[in-house]
Amino acid sequence: MGASLNEIKQRIASTKKTSQITKAMQMVSAAKLTKSEGASKSFQEYSSKIRSVVTHLVAAQLSELRETEQSSLSEGNYHVMLAQRPVKKTGYIVITSDKGLVGGYNSSILKQTMSMIQEDHDSNKEYALIAIGGTGADFFKARGIDVSYELRGLTDQPTFEEVRKIVTTATTMYQNEVFDELYVCYNHHVNSLTSQFRVEKMLPITDLDPSEATSYEQEYLLEPSPEAILDQLLPQYAESLIYGAIIDAKTAEHAAGMTAMKTATDNAQNIISDLTISYNRARQGAITQEITEIVAGAAALE
């Protein structure tokens, strides 16, 4: 019985240490989440401004584009970032974390992405994958799926400079017709307890509404020309959309980490409670047995 008591005490002590670690990790993730939510809010302000400017600049092109037959879009009359072309190959940017301890965050993304790819494509020649996050890159490679480009080791609050190369690579691959459309697959941050899997079309750019341009009484003086400005601004806008998805995904990752560590801490506390009850019962049994032995010994001496 004594050995059993010592074993239970050791398990209680080790579980308490684990609980302290998971509690600390929960607090760290909560701090990261707060910071990421602030960064996401700031980015939304920037995104709204650049979207407004781009909408004004391409309003005329978009109006014509929507009235033009699909077959005429390959003649070069429209900017490559706007014109839809026949889809021979699809590009996917899949955003996951580099590490674990984030609950079902990664499994949700990868499971639904694989399901979508298998449903929409008959062979791996019909799509190209770009992986942001080591978990996703390793997942695809382990299944014999080629990863065209990957990025690992993002910081907790990624700057655009950190992701510039992979974002620019993705837009350049589209412009060079390596693939004909580009989607980003990631978990969207809803709140601290909830995230939602999203597949957002980034290229060609389709989220601009010409009617929004007429809602602002603004005029732009364009130098050297609207076309030259669009050549610079449209890729930048597309890159900002991808960067926004990365920030959103990182925020969801921190929320998932915080939730996972809270669950781990709560589970540890439940285990400690159960072990404490077991310890008290074992201790009570040991005391009862000792009393019984003493009484029996005293009776034998009479």
Swiss-Prot record:
Q: Which family does it belong to?
A: Belongs to the ATPase gamma chain family.
Q: Which GO terms are recorded in the biological process aspect for this UniProt protein?
A: proton motive force-driven plasma membrane ATP synthesis
User: How does the UniProt record describe the way this protein sits in the membrane?
Assistant: Peripheral membrane protein
Q: What does this protein do?
A: Produces ATP from ADP in the presence of a proton gradient across the membrane. The gamma chain is believed to be important in regulating ATPase activity and the flow of protons through the CF(0) complex.
Asked whether the keyword Membrane is assigned, the reply is yes
Residues of the signal peptide: none
Could you name the domain of life of the organism this protein comes from?
Bacteria
According to the record's subunit comment, the protein's assembly and interactions are: F-type ATPases have 2 components, CF(1) - the catalytic core - and CF(0) - the membrane proton channel. CF(1) has five subunits: alpha(3), beta(3), gamma(1), delta(1), epsilon(1). CF(0) has three main subunits: a, b and c.
Intracellular or extracellular location(s): Cell membrane
Q: What protein am I looking at? A: ATP synthase gamma chain
Entry keywords, A to Z? ATP synthesis, Cell membrane, CF(1), Hydrogen ion transport, Ion transport, Membrane, Transport
What SUPFAM superfamilies does its record include? Answer: ATP synthase (F1-ATPase), gamma subunit
- MF term (GO), any: ATP binding
**GO CC terms, sorted:** plasma membrane; proton-transporting ATP synthase complex
